Amino acid sequence: MSDFVNAISEAVKAGLSADWVTMGTSIADALAKGADFILGFFN
């Protein structure tokens, strides 16, 4: 779960500094980590 929080934090920091490429990749990373976390409950 901490990886998910870190990915969200990176996306927010990138957004605040208008680093759109980093923000986009951080959001994608957060979504992937969140999906992995949720799917972990079903395995």
Curated annotation (Swiss-Prot):
It holds the Pfam family PSMbeta. GO terms for molecular function: toxin activity. Keywords: Cytolysis, Formylation, Hemolysis, Secreted, Toxin, Virulence. It comes from Staphylococcus cohnii subsp. cohnii. The modification N-formylmethionine is found at residue 1. This is Hemolysin H3C. Belongs to the staphylococcal hemolytic protein family. InterPro entries: PSMbeta (IPR008846). One of its GO terms (biological process) is killing of cells of another organism. Virulence factor. Causes hemolysis of erythrocytes from sheep (HD(50)=2.63 mM), rabbit (HD(50)=2.37 mM), guinea pig (HD(50)=1.98 mM), dog (HD(50)=1.02 mM) and human (HD(50)=2.07 mM). Acts synergistically with beta-hemolysins from S.aureus ATCC 25923. Cytotoxic towards human dermal fibroblasts. It is found in: Secreted. One of its GO terms (cellular component) is extracellular region.
